């Protein structure tokens, strides 16, 4: 039997940390969240909260000194803070050497190239002239900030080099990629323990709107066996090579029978929210099991399909009124609200719906979504 860590610290107080709170209680793990503000999503519900910035080495050190293992709600923790954390001697999962590949998109592209895993064609851009040269080959490119991007922030399509001048002046270096005309986007998730045991989740179909995850279907309908196999192989190869501990998500573009890696995340991921209600072991519980050194859980889906739809801030400010309508209209829907103030297009929750018929599940999940986020929507 492995040694289990009981006291878990989470850096960041967003919705991902919040969704760890329930599973932590079930497993009798003591979760402490480091959050900026007591009103942050996870800070509202965690039994133990430390107030401080995840970017502040002192605050991170304090967290590390009070727990057995530290994990993350988001990966954008500065290197100084990670170094301070390492000095406390607590376990850090995923380890900073692995986390790098989720923090730095250039390091990630270099790693994938080394592992001979297909990526979009990519360029390291340090000057406007380099971008202009790359544009001569492709006409249009996706330019990305190397660090700090999320939900499509830090991703821009450009046709002329000038369009990236502001980012280049600020960051000095950017990643440019060819535009992949994909059939659809996929998400592959694997959980890995410190001892290297791994469990895969079914590969899912993801749909992004304005660079932001909007809908997920698990498993990806009609996925060719070869594509699913390759998605799992890629996730396993990356997890093993860099020593991930916890959940790894690999965002993929499917083009016919081929897949290209978009990016990596080393934490529970939006593409796995379906598993909270649709799989034997949800991704938040699985992440905690892995970082706590507990055996991993079964990842099998309960139903033929689960559809997850994100609730993005719209016209309704008080979501509870809409939630009551949705729960009445679609009794099978599982609702997850993040306790966040509603702002335009902000992720404020999600719904899950499991069953047999994907078309019906999609319709009903969107019905619930609209009732929750839009003022005056009728059943
Ligand atoms: N090379 C590409 N070709 C085509 N579309 C792309 C490409 N890169 C990104 N996109 C689109 O933009 C979305 C966001 O890109 P990416 O995942 O790199 O950004 P992010 O802001 O880091 O996202 P996340 O919210 O997942 O952290 C992708 O899901 C995809 O829809
Ligand atoms: Mg992404």
Regions flagged by a language model, labelled:
Residues 4, 289-379:
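Peripheral (often C-terminal) accessory segments that flank ATP-dependent C-N-forming ligase machineries
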Residues 154-256:
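Internal nucleotide-binding/catalytic subdomain
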Residues 229-250, 255, 265-314:
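Active-site "cap" helix and flanking loop/linker of ATP-utilizing ligase/carboxylase catalytic domains
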